[in-house]
Regions:
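N-terminal subdomain of nucleotide-sugar transferases
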Residues: 1-43, 146, 152-155
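A short, charged, and often flexible helix/loop element on the N-terminal side
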Residues: 51-78, 125-129
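Short N-terminal targeting/anchoring amphipathic segment
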Residues: 76-94, 107-110
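Helix N-cap/beta->alpha junction signal
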Residues: 91, 151-152
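Active-site proximal beta-strand in glycosyltransferases
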Residues: 102-120, 148
């Protein structure tokens, strides 16, 4: 029987995200074929040896709405082309592409909300941007197969 393939997606450059690395190592140790997809930044260090595959996309935009639009569009096509058995979206900023691809491929999407994304300090004094993320959250979170977070206060 072939390995079940999981694609884990993040918007960072993979090198310093120890929590996601632990999740990927655990999944790999359980026998899953894991691909961690993120982005490459100028000056990004190599991801180093890992017991799972990594892929870093070079994006034209580094921040703002064009970054999120480009990232999610490219991630969406990556997810469709790789034909995984399961998708794991880390944070709200990766969830739109995962939910759409999951719906088309008819596979489950797991949502890792390790922070309350719409309450991060970067959005505190930006009400329009915060409203946009809240609008997206209301539309994409309800359709996930499962979700988890790091603490009870975020789950509540």
């Amino acid at each position: 029987m072939a390995l079940k393939k999981i694609i884990v997606s993040v918007t960072n450059d993979l090198t310093c995200d120890q929590r996601v690395d632990r999740v990927c190592r655990t999944l790999s140790g359980m026998g899953f074929g894991v691909l961690l997809a993120g982005r490459r930044l100028p000056g990004s260090l190599p991801p180093g040896h890992r017991p799972y595959a990594t892929l870093r996309m070079h994006l034209l935009f580094r921040k703002g709405p064009l970054f999120y639009a480009e990232y999610n569009l490219r991630l969406f096509f990556l997810l469709l082309n790789r034909q995984p058995d399961l998708l794991l979206a880390n944070d709200l900023d990766t969830l739109a592409a995962n939910r759409l691809a999951g719906k088309i491929l008819r596979i489950p999407v797991i949502y890792d909300s390790h922070e309350y994304f719409t309450e991060v300090p970067e959005l505190t004094h930006r009400p329009r941007v915060k409203k946009t993320w809240e609008w997206l959250e209301k539309r994409v979170v309800p359709g996930v197969a499962a979700a988890y977070t790091v603490c009870q206060s975020i789950a509540d």
